[in-house]
Amino acid sequence: MIARTLKALTTGALPDELDVVVVCNGCKDGTATIARGFGAPIRVIETALGNKTHALNLGDKVARAFPRIYVDADVVVTLSTIRALAERLERGGVLAVAPRPYFDLTGCSWPVRAFYDIRCRLPSFGEGIGGSGVYALSEIARRRFNDFPNLVADDTYVRVQFKHEERETLTCVKSVVFAPHTINDLIAIEARADFGTFELARVHPELWTNKGDGNYKALMCLFKHPSLWLRLFIYCYVRALARRKAKMRLRHNDFIWERDLTSRGAAGAPNSSSPSSL
């Protein structure tokens, strides 16, 4: 998995163009060795603590450059996309940018495909920060908060630091997000996201005005099209179960970091924690 990410990220880079920090958090496989095998501009940090926000903070402490781009290890983003994000921030006018997510549905069951068909029609699909696995911050933007707090929804925490006019999703570039293959894995991943959202709203209610538009009105409009009804039923079914699961865990303070191994292939060994790269 990390080889796929780093190859796409670094292919064609000019000397000294990138400073890439890979933080292997709780990894028990060969992730660190694979990352080091790429050589410059990759730097690798290892920590025994399998905690994403801890990894983000470690990476931030050693990262040298701005704009600073945060990339989940299980998505694919090309060098041209990285350049586009950096160039947009350098032009000014916004503080945070992200690419638009492209969901790779290879190997996914029909219900999963139906779910993402509906998702891509909703306003939240246009929010790259928190959906694409990639976001870029200017130096001024990074000063908006201190360390990443120990929250599940770290990317949403970043997004709500900025008003709508301070952030932008670039529709001309994309990140490839690998969707879970089965509906059970999809529900688990959605429940994790919902848990993070509920937790963030509880801990930082003062930031919630920056969350962005909801999906309810757009979702209701889709019901005007009978050809979408079956897909809408699946979407609503997944969302209802995920929200219920997340609320129960929040009530009992019982969070489990749900990981989708179906979209990771051999790289997603059950005992390995995914690294975060910056």
Region locations from a protein language model:
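Short beta-strand/loop segment that forms part of the nucleotide-sugar
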Residues: 6, 17-26, 45
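A conserved acidic beta->alpha catalytic loop
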Residues: 8, 24-32, 49
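Short aromatic/hydrophobic "clamp" motif used to bind/position activated sugar donors
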Residues: 68
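Terminal low-complexity segments of carbohydrate-biosynthetic enzymes
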Residues: 179-180, 188-278
